[in-house]
Curated annotation (Swiss-Prot):
CDD domains, alphabetized: PLPDE_III_AR (cd00430)
GO cellular component, one term: cytosol
Keyword Signal part of the UniProt annotation: no
Name of the featured protein: Alanine racemase
GO annotation, biological process: D-alanine biosynthetic process; peptidoglycan biosynthetic process
UniProt family annotation: Belongs to the alanine racemase family.
Annotated signal peptide: none
Amino acid sequence: MTIGNFRPATVLIDETAILHNIQHEVARLKKQTQLFAVVKADAYGHGMLRVARVAKAAGATGFCVAILDEALGLRKADYSEPVLVLGIVPSQYAAIAAAQTISLPVSSTEWLEQALPVLEAQPELPPLRIHLALDTGMGRIGFTEDQALKTAVAFVEAHPKQFVIEGVFTHFATADAPDDTYFKQQVDKFNHLVNLLPSRPRYVHVSNSATSLWHAACNGNMIRYGVAIYGLNPSGDAIPTTPFPLEPALSLKSELTYCKQVHAGDGISYGVTYRAKGDEFIGTVPIGYADGWLRRLQGFHVLVDGQYCEIVGRICMDQFMIRLPKAYPAGTKVVLVGQSGDQEITLLDVAKYSKTIHYEIACNLTPRLKRQSVNPVD
């Protein structure tokens, strides 16, 4: 997708906020516990390489991504730190990961059996580093049964030139919820399955941001620190208090491209779902649903000159309209996410109106919106 460099619409990334959010968590960790920065999905829309650079400066010792392509992107950018792919990678690509010392998750002996000939075909490669995924209640990937796990471990031990168990992990489904009943059940199952291993691997990890923030006693010797890097509370506002203040890193700003006066009954946008109630000033903002500004945000608001201005009419692919308190010239600043005067719109505000989570809003902001760092970290 083409980046809109010649359009007044910018995602601003505060690098100092990212540094703060990581450094404060690193300071809370036990000495033996490492922090891997989760930079999947282009670092939740913040820019993978930008965040990786700041995370490394802040004390992160490794990275987690979702797909092999993201891991290769880090290697191409000369990041030599450990990189763990969190999603299942097709077995035919096992040799690519091994060649780049990229760690992969394993959820079945079948995957190991399929990857074996791929790795045997290139005997010069180092053993593939694998992390055994344990499904303790997330229901996504991982071993659930004792015997299945034992069989996989035995297979790995029988092929030491092709595989090495570097880690074991699980993922909690409710770490961000006030009720920890299910969370504790998952902890118990994880401990049971880990105790089946002949020895503990280098990395034993269970903690995402929510787990590390609110259940730090469960941290193994590595945490997968994700959404909190970006200053977003993993729970939304279900658990409003965090051990230290999280600083939001992302803001979204634009400008008016056009302003006009309309009169009572005049229609705005597709379907004419909004008609002016009287003489009104309508401004046009050059962002639309093709940029990830969701169509269902009609009726929400943005900030102009420190004032809330309602989004009127349907949001178009590339533009939307707002009702202004007075006439403003083209070029007037518009804040979609962030501060203007004494007012602020957060990603969580946008998410609540959209009936979703702030993770999704951040990830939905498309590459067409140019990204720009503020408060850069050397």
